[in-house]
């Protein structure tokens, strides 16, 4: 008998080479799959940015997806499980400056490195469909989409105050500003007025919101809630305040009014002041008309240079503008303030302030000693609260509100909106928190925006036949501004419309555009990539993505944009689906010492070192066993060693297997008890595997599947029947192949010619129990365990229970006898 020494390095390199040479994981052509009536599964883990090295978060993400893909292949599905690279972005330019290299060179070198590192994990990717988003052919179709959206009116260009990163020298979307800092480099963000291109994601706000209902039960509720809140649909009243006569003189404009939007028209009688954003036009009018002190102007400019999120986090700051508006119902004069909590890009950039019933307004009014007025009570005919601020910011019943007093908030909202509409001084409208998506970036390493600036024609899209507009490679990247803006040879071009001299747009696209449609591109075979963005037949066959795996941090960035882009491409006629991802799994972070792994904390675990020391199967087993996929995973060196020991034992004990090409037939009733128990545990593990993969129990709780397999293996070790051993391995290698593929392929090849990597059914006879273990407790404390035959009467169960604990029943009175069928007997005594 050959020596059973487990050598993962040799086994894993052998099978990785085999899978590559035989293209083992390429999906079948759809005509073959369709003719064979094969069901499809599209399994996709979010693709990585090629930073240069994989980390444990990558390992966990891709092992989860790989386990799903391998299981579905075993069960006869045609599986698409692709991989690619989210390759554009600022880090490549930063590296170019630091290492004196070209961003393209740095990026593609990193891709080569990470591709090799991921290959050592034995991931079953479709290598034929791999691409990087920086590939020219990918950019070509992305630019085509941009042009089609421009022609459809879904893209426009305007000047606005934008989030500007002084270090990276680029615009950031609101979502890319984290606590007032750049999401990439952590530099404090300032506001800068610039032209940029916007995509009208707001045109799809209602559909994006409504379609979330279709995803209930298929996406995590937290992600759905985050997207609903980000879209932020609210209904309310839009109306205008007239300025007082003396204020109009200060403004230098006799016709200006102050437009506001409120979701709480029921509190309109509680307005004691109005607040405007520092960018509001009336502020500029007051400055131009020299109606503000220089010190106030400087303070307002300082607020302008603060990001929206930083304003929200900071203390409430404002300045009295010295002008007044007239309350449309009470005719009271109300002061107008500029305030840091009012944003120009939400609503009209002005708000009515009700300090008694709004926490933010209250804080501001308290700071600047502005008046309060209570117009709501909790109960009908309730007394006006004596405390400084009403306990309810919520709805209630109106007081001090003229003809609307006594009404509930909901009734008053409708009546007040109707009153304003009948008087033609306002109207009920729907508003959204969602803003149009600013997609211009002042950087080199991105997809060029395919627009041309012509003095005669204005802004003109490039001709489709001239695409792709590629990046020049002879650029100087020194960290100062946009290298494309300085490359005059590249910028100079002819106008696609009139043929005169013109200049290319030097801004590049936000990299979230690239990740908004990559999952659609995978559906098309490589041989068709040059001809079209998508092959419709292939796309119809593969989409939706059946399982999409990635971090919850992408909930309101990538996932919202991907849903939006899918709907746009549908409306442009490229695709026919409404939603891209049928199911979403958000995996938890990998922690060490209770914190997320990072270089700054010094708690990094290098996957390459882990694989070199223990093997890929050990790494895979650990990350899938240590915690359910959706939970955080705490690194544990001892657990890694334990995973390796299990695989070593699995390898060594294979000496008991007899070669065969089909599962042995065993008469369960003729076996000894320990043999029956081993078979029972083996088929319980198979049943658990089937349930986890088919019913997605607990978000694919692989840890319970692995635990059941280990329990079955231990039970096999307690018996010596070679047929039971052989059947046990036949089934266990089938169960574990998605988790630890290398060792399973090697053992299966040696003993079963890989015939066990096909659908297996549970032997119900093996699961039939003739007896059950009862825990016997006295006053809730476990005192014994008793094996009892199934089918006993309650009286018989109690008799056996009492016989098992005689010393605990001496000198006591039994007050109550409780039976939990097939589990427990509790005797309550005194």
Swiss-Prot record:
Catalytic activity, reaction form: tRNA(Leu) + L-leucine + ATP = L-leucyl-tRNA(Leu) + AMP + diphosphate
Sequence motif: 'KMSKS' region, positions: 596-600
InterPro entries: aa-tRNA-synth_I_CS (IPR001412), Leu-tRNA-ligase (IPR002302), Leu_tRNA-synth_edit (IPR025709), Methionyl/Leucyl_tRNA_Synth (IPR015413), Rossmann-like_a/b/a_fold (IPR014729), tRNAsynth_Ia_anticodon-bd (IPR009080), Val/Leu/Ile-tRNA-synth_edit (IPR009008)
Residue ranges annotated as motif 'HIGH' region: 48-58
Enzyme class: ligase
BP GO annotations: leucyl-tRNA aminoacylation
Pfam family, one: tRNA-synt_1g
Keywords on record: Aminoacyl-tRNA synthetase, ATP-binding, Cytoplasm, Ligase, Nucleotide-binding, Protein biosynthesis
PROSITE patterns linked to this entry: AA_TRNA_LIGASE_I
GO cellular component, one term: cytosol
Subcellular localization, as worded in the UniProt entry: Cytoplasm
EC number: 6.1.1.4
Gene Ontology molecular function, alphabetical: aminoacyl-tRNA deacylase activity; ATP binding; leucine-tRNA ligase activity
Domain of life of the organism encoding this protein: Bacteria
Family assignment from sequence similarity: Belongs to the class-I aminoacyl-tRNA synthetase family.
Name recorded for this polypeptide: Leucine--tRNA ligase
Organism encoding this protein: Helicobacter hepaticus (strain ATCC 51449 / 3B1)
Gene: leuS
